[in-house]
Amino acid sequence: MERENYNDSINKGEFTMKTIKEILTESNGVLKLAVHNGVFHADDVLCVAMIKNKLKELGLSREVEIIRSRNPETLAQADIIMDVGGGKYDHHSSDNPMQENGVLMAACGKVADELYEGEELKMLHDYVLDSVQASDNGQKRSDLGENLFSWIRLFNTSLSESSKLSDERFAQAVEMAETVFDRQLFMIREEIADRKRIFIKVR
């Protein structure tokens, strides 16, 4: 679907857009990522953190611009829209899918499913994503993802702070989430490699 048609259908869920990986690699220009404004959670923060992580993995030095809005015209300027707008990477609808383990999908799960695969993706869901998704959808789990959800909430502006600081706080939350996610992904890959080494020895 051409960009202008995609813009026109932003709130209709009529998306045949490229995958995130295709969008990341199709240009060297500024990558515009859109999420909702106002109070943020681990879900939308993690979406941005994962994409920035993947850019580094791919060796791409694209500048990232974060757009925080609920205005359709503003969102339409973005390359990837997450957790808002009613599209491919939003989960605020009555037909939001539930995974086999009973956890409802959130934006971070939808994004991760396009960035990772196989055992790596499964372990990301088990160790981090599913608890973030559960928390964001009002379900309850308790592990690293739940802790991350709680930590990121602390970055939202308090009643005594100016709401104008919200975008700055969001960027700080993304930076923290990047650090946690990078380390978790590294440990997952180490665990997978260890399993393979053990399997080879056993054989």
Where are these regions (language model features)?
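Small/flexible residues
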Residues: 5, 20, 64, 197-199
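Glycine-rich, Lys/Arg-enriched anion-binding loops that position phosphate/diphosphate groups
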Residues: 139-203
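Short, positively charged and aromatic/hydrophobic N-terminal segments
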Residues: 3-9
